């Protein structure tokens, strides 16, 4: 890693490379732009302070992401914030919008778009009502499309635990959505 070797420009490159994606994820968790920016900055500071602890067993981004997500989850727990209800606004600046697009590409008629918008709202209300650990799994796996291995590294749990938590999170979400979609 160039920063470890004294290349001070490398830090700026890392921030430029990862800040937007990290900020977007943190915004999804804490739902406040100022808090997300502060958590993002804090994550970079903590990473720089602990750069000697980075073992390169995983990617730098995975290590940085673990720091940031842990800080965000602690922040949310401390503040008692568990709302994802305005999550769609967190996707407005998403670098890769195709990863979070729930609308059908065929929804070209205004009524079709209205129905798709309603489905999104129902989905986010259901996600909002999940317990924090379930929301985290939905966010990391289904929204950020991280691998089981990446999630395991970030949350410092086994892949088996990741898989079972994702299954339980999806099942909880399915049960919350079932009454709405039963007629379809």
Enumerate the predicted regions with their spans.
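N-terminal module of bacterial RNA polymerase sigma factors
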Residues: 1-21, 28, 108-112, 128, ...
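Short, basic/polar amphipathic helix motif occurring as a linker/hinge flanking DNA-binding modules
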Residues: 76-101, 114
């Amino acid at each position: 890693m160039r920063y470890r070797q004294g290349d001070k420009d490398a830090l700026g490159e890392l921030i430029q490379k990862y800040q937007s994606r990290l900020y977007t994820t943190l915004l999804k968790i804490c739902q406040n732009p100022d808090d997300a920016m502060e958590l993002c900055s804090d994550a970079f500071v903590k990473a720089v302070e602990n750069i000697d602890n980075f073992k390169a067993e995983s990617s730098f981004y995975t290590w940085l992401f673990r720091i940031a997500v842990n800080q965000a989850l602690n922040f949310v727990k401390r503040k008692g914030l568990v709302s994802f209800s305005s999550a769609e606004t967190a996707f407005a600046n998403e670098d890769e919008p195709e990863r979070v697009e729930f609308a059908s590409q065929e929804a070209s008629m205004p009524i079709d778009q209205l129905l798709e918008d309603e489905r999104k709202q129902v989905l986010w209300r259901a996600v909002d009502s999940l317990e924090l650990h379930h929301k985290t799994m939905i966010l990391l796996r289904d929204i950020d499309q991280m691998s089981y291995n990446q999630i395991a590294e970030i949350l410092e749990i086994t892949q088996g635990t990741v898989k079972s938590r994702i299954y339980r999170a999806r099942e909880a979400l399915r049960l919350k959505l079932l009454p709405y979609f039963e007629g379809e």
